[in-house]
């Protein structure tokens, strides 16, 4: 059990390879062999990373970098992921990819994901439970799908 934090800002090491970046996720673990095995499992799962494992991270697209950041956190085998603004700065196709990855981690790997997201629509579509904040205070709370259809939320955040 553990918690991993995925930063909002680009946090890959650009001159290190994709594989080296992944292994940094397990740097603080005592069991380095376990980190190597988990990194290999992740590389097998994500073809985009596997195909670029020996390339420097600076050649990755924004979406691929975000995938690498998420994957690096997974090397620690956390049960909880704190994810800060996963869609920020990404093209729409990569936003979809990132949320598909997060949904897979939630549903298939049983990860608990606590998400902060400026794209209210994507965040609420993803959320089991959502909190809408106004000036740092909880304005509305509820199930994600209910908030998505709440006209007050729509007026405030979704342009509805």
Model-derived features: positions:
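Conserved catalytic motifs of ABC-family nucleotide-binding domains
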Residues: 77
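Hydrophobic anchor residue at the start of the ABC signature
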Residues: 70
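Helical segment within the ABC ATPase nucleotide-binding domain
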Residues: 96-110
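ABC-type ATPase nucleotide-binding domains, specifically the catalytic core motifs of the NBD
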Residues: 16-37, 45-47, 142, 158-160
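Conserved ABC ATPase signature
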Residues: 56-60
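ABC ATPase C-loop
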Residues: 73-74
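Catalytic Walker B motif of ABC-type/P-loop ATPase nucleotide-binding domains
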Residues: 81-85
């Amino acid at each position: 059990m553990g918690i991993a934090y995925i930063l909002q800002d680009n946090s890959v090491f650009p001159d290190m390879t994709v594989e080296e970046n992944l292994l940094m996720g397990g740097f603080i673990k005592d069991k380095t062999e376990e980190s190597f095995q988990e990194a290999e499992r992740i590389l097998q799962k994500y073809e985009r990373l596997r195909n670029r494992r020996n390339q420097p991270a600076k050649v990755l697209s924004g979406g691929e970098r975000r995938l690498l950041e998420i994957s690096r956190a997974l090397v620690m085998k956390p049960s909880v992921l704190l994810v800060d603004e996963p869609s920020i700065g990404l093209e729409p196709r990569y936003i979809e990819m990132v949320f598909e990855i997060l949904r897979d981690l939630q549903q298939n790997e049983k990860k608990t994901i606590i998400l902060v997201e400026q794209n209210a629509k994507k965040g609420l579509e993803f959320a089991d439970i959502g909190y809408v904040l106004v000036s740092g205070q909880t304005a509305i709370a509820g199930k994600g799908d209910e908030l998505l259809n709440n006209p007050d939320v729509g007026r405030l955040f979704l342009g509805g």
